Amino acid sequence: MVIGGGLLQVPVIQTAQKMGLRVIVTDYNPNALGMKYADIPIVMSTRDIEGSVRVAKKQHEITPISGVLTVGTDASATVAAVANALNLPGIKFEDAIAATNKIKMRTRFFEHGVPSPHFFPVWSLSDAKKACKVLGFPVVIKPSDNMGARGVVRIDNKNQIADAFAFAKSASPSGELIIEEFMEGHELSIDAVVFNGEVTFTGIADRVIEYPPHFVETGHTMPSQLPKEMQDSACEVMKAGIKALGIHLGCAKGDIKITKDGPKIGELAARLSGGFMSAYTYPLSTGVNLMRAAIEIALGQEPGNLEPLYNRVSIERAIITRPGIVKKICCVEEALKIPGIAEIFINVKPGDKVKKPTSNVEKAGHIIAVADTLEEAEDAVRKCKEMINIEICDESELSMDTINISARERLRKVCYVCKQCNGKDCASGVPGMGGAGSGASFKRNSEALLNYKINTRVIHDVTNPDTSSSLFGIHLSFPVMAAPITGAVTNLGGAIDELDYNIAVVKGCMDAGTIAFLGDGADPEKYKIAMEALHQFGGMGIPIFKPRANNDEIIKRIKAAEEAGAVAVGMDIDAIVFKTMELKHQAVKPKSLSELKSILSSTHLPFILKGIMNPRDAAMAVEAGAHALVVSNHGGRVLDEMVGTMDVLEDIVREVRGHIHILIDGGFRTGVDILKALALGAEYVLIGRPVAIAAVGMGSEAVAYYLKTLQAELKKAMILTGCATINDITSDIVRKIHHNSYQPLEIR
């Protein structure tokens, strides 16, 4: 059982499988890379100790577990708890806690006479000031319960204490901090394996620490270039620390400072190192698979031969860009062909906002090289950095032009990113970004909007209109939300990962002060990706599910949305004949009034029916108990030759206004378009394709930028029509200029 399913756990998962073992992987993120490799993936936070023990016991009854470990995560306590609960090889839980909590760790070292800095536990700013007074400057403040240099900062004088305290506090899950002496000197990172109390040191690397007053590791060199006697003395100190922490079986990773007073322990963890050392640079340098040794020990077996097969130099160096927004990334595949380059990991994607790093988790990427000499390895990294192009633009340079250019490059022939997104020149249909059949329904949405023109009012005192609104108790900066879109591969041609898309839209909407609707998709498992995005952002979104033939499948998705903390849920009830569902062989069917009532009764969340196009269905939505409806023809994607949503809005408003919230989508592209819909009685507007284009182009930053642009346009339109608030927008500010031949159905 491997606790943690991130990138750094993949090598140990793969090694275990090569050893003929079945691997259970637990991680909070169901889409974590390691979960894809797992034989048995289990969604569980690595920090949830009780939950991890519970699922381990349950799984143990089905598939007996023979060992448990982690690599590169701060989950040693979870590993120990599971091992103790299942009577597996491991260390005591209290020892694992001491190897995780920096205050308990320092206390153990003090009690056993292990060289380490003097320290004080800190809870309040007053505590911090007292500690600084006793220790003297410089000191280091850090969370007692985090890793990756998060919240770690040097304090050089009393004027820096308050800001440093706040910075460290923000990175501490518990709020507990530690202040300790600053140790000047070269730093080593050392891995060791321990079996029956016998310690075997494996990799010893030189750490490169930069970006003061923070402590950002920008790389390491394997093996260390320090004299052997210095390395040996560091190992002796680490061995004393291992004994003090009670690590008699398993692995240990130490950060050792070579100070003027001799080696001192900075950190010591009951696991192998992260930072690409134990899993990448060590085996490249020595030919020894340390993951195999860790697995053998976790199974209670003596590790195999750990003698190096050769002695090469392997280095890891961080890719750090200038601050700004990632515009494009290219030439990574070409850079991998440079002699000596073993691996390249890119942590950012277009649209990500990057800043000057303050911790080890804020780097744009990593390069791993191997050669016979340090000079050759460094030269390979230099060439690699010169070739890789991570183009950054300043936030001030962000514009719809830069967003659209980036999106056009990524979407290629799926979407031309036309200047006017109105369906007239679409590159694709369904699947894709276009409309069904001839695309007439998609086009009609835009044409229907053009039937209405604005009638200005300019003698008034409105200078700063209030665009705010609210839905189901959620404050909105303006009554516009992202429409549900799914199918990153099916509809967007793989231009963006499905989870990345959902995250970009949810985060972008939140940054703009509104919320996103999320799609279900034809793939029966795809809804879980939307749920993951909701989990990450506190449920700030509204998932819309397909009208699947089996109502239990709909209710299952609703329950998942409840668990994710969703604001509301809904169903795009018009997707009863939909091409992408047919392609995936997913059964859908219309819902009767009684079925709708049954589905709605299954949840306490507000329920939205999307796909209403006539007063009759609107009235039945009210009768079913829906809290909101969306006037929508599915972006013209379910049927050709449909009327536009603005063609029917007034009739629906007359039928159900005051009984249900009324939303609308379909061709809305500008603040003026939004004003028209609000004037005719819609309370909220959903926008789909332009938001998707922004998300593909430059991620959440672009989504937020686009939505804020719409809000600014709406404000200008409100000023020119004398509307101080959203409630002041009335039908007398629009005029219909074309005859509309649509006749609403008579309700009998």
Model-derived segments and spans:
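N-terminal functional module of multi-domain proteins
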Residues: 442-522, 527
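Peripheral (often C-terminal) accessory segments that flank ATP-dependent C-N-forming ligase machineries
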Residues: 128, 295-397
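ATP-binding N-terminal substructure of ATP-dependent carboxylate-amine bond-forming enzymes
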Residues: 1-95, 126, 348-353, 357-362, ...
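Internal nucleotide-binding/catalytic subdomain
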Residues: 154-263, 272
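Active-site "cap" helix and flanking loop/linker of ATP-utilizing ligase/carboxylase catalytic domains
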Residues: 233-254, 260, 269-329
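A conserved helix-loop-beta module that forms one wall/lid of the active-site cleft
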Residues: 84-151, 158
